[in-house]
Swiss-Prot record:
Organism in which the protein naturally occurs: Mesorhizobium japonicum (strain LMG 29417 / CECT 9101 / MAFF 303099) (Mesorhizobium loti (strain MAFF 303099))
Subcellular localization, as worded in the UniProt entry: Cell inner membrane
Family statement drawn from the similarity comment of this UniProt entry: Belongs to the CDP-alcohol phosphatidyltransferase class-I family.
A biological process term (GO) from this entry: phospholipid biosynthetic process
The protein's name: Phosphatidylcholine synthase
Length: 268
């Protein structure tokens, strides 16, 4: 009898779930799992980079970029933040973004070494340090959802450098300028969340992605014969021009809209 009472007291101390997991909670948590899948894509990309399989690396980064582009709208649609207030989707997103947008591109730039060992090492240092500081800035977004300063999309920058191959000093200058612009109050576009010129900005973003996919497809065909190749040498001039023009547009349109605040605004 005493043993039963002791066992009952012990079971009473064990915390029990107050309620079952509801369908909205399970659905909301699945969005966090979608975001978290980017970490595995980052791992696959890192493996490819360590083996100097640049085409595969950028395919994995591109897939991670796609996941990053859809998880936010889905989370807002399903009201994930309100349903699971103790789970921070924003923190999870930032952790994965730092790896896929910053750390792996910096490693690839250093590993590729087309700027020479010294400049590649210095460029990687500029990328990872400036980006870490940027992610700590809680005021990185404006009221219109522009990014304030270069939004550390080093995956796009490094991809462009791999494809265009402008030379070591031009490449280094691009890294330095982008690193400085991280801390300059110039607006950069968020193609989805900025309302002004959104259809056109989305079109240019999709065009950049399309040119990027074509570049990787061309490189993949060439890599069928040589798995470890130079990405830029395998891409046609037309695609290089397309990536350059659309990339420059996305880099500059935010600043242009900042200085022309009525550009793209709906008339009252």
């Amino acid at each position: 009898m005493a043993a039963r009472k002791a066992a009952k007291k012990l079971t009473d101390r064990i915390p029990r779930p107050k309620k079952k997991v509801t369908w909205p909670q399970a659905r909301a948590f699945s969005v966090h799992l979608l975001t978290a899948s980017g970490s595995f894509l980052a791992f696959l990309s890192l493996v490819a980079a360590s083996e100097e399989r640049w085409t595969a690396m950028f395919w994995w980064l591109g897939l991670a970029l796609f996941v990053d582009g859809i998880d936010g709208p889905i989370a807002r649609k399903l009201e994930v933040k309100e349903i699971l207030p103790t789970w921070s989707g924003e923190l999870l997103d930032n952790i994965i973004d730092y790896v896929t947008y910053v750390l792996i591109p910096a490693f690839a730039l250093y590993q590729r070494g087309f700027m020479g060992e010294g400049l590649s090492f210095l460029s990687a240092a500029i990328i990872v340090v400036s980006s870490a500081i940027y992610y700590a800035d809680t005021g990185m977004k404006t009221k219109e959802n522009f990014f304030k300063g270069f939004p550390v999309v080093w995956n796009m920058v490094v991809f462009t450098l791999f494809v265009i191959e402008p030379g070591q000093w031009v490449s280094f200058a691009v890294v330095v300028v982008a690193g400085i612009l991280t801390f300059v109050p110039i607006n950069f576009i968020h193609p989805v969340r900025v309302v002004r010129l959104r259809p056109f900005n989305l079109t240019m973003t999709l065009l950049w992605c399309a040119f990027g996919a074509l570049a990787l497809a061309q490189a993949a065909l060439a890599a069928f014969y040589d798995q470890i190749g130079v990405l830029g040498a395998q891409v046609s001039t037309f695609i290089k021009i397309g990536i350059t023009i659309t990339g420059l547009y996305l880099a500059c349109i935010g600043g242009i809209m900042q200085f022309f605040p009525n550009l793209g605004a709906k008339k009252a």
